[in-house]
Amino acid sequence: MTTILLKENEPFEVAIRRFRRAIEKNGLIAELRERQAYEKPTAVRKRKKAAAVKRLHKRLRSQMLPKKLH
């Protein structure tokens, strides 16, 4: 479980921000979203493959040289 200690004279909003950052870093929010509803194994594979293809296209797009302007 993620805990934070309140520092002396620390505003509540700052403590909440630190807590949110901590649980985001732990991956708790992502896991909660994944477990919210059951996803078939085939759907998981399909989603992961689509994400991999998207990453590949993004990497290739950034490596391409710009076209020459005449």
Curated annotation (Swiss-Prot):
GO biological process: translation
Keywords on record: Ribonucleoprotein, Ribosomal protein
GO cellular component: ribonucleoprotein complex; ribosome
A Pfam family this chain is assigned to: Ribosomal_S21
GO molecular function: structural constituent of ribosome
Gene3D superfamilies in the cross-refs: Ribosomal protein S8
Family (UniProt): Belongs to the bacterial ribosomal protein bS21 family.
HAMAP family: Ribosomal_bS21
Full protein name: Small ribosomal subunit protein bS21A
Originating species: Burkholderia pseudomallei (strain K96243)
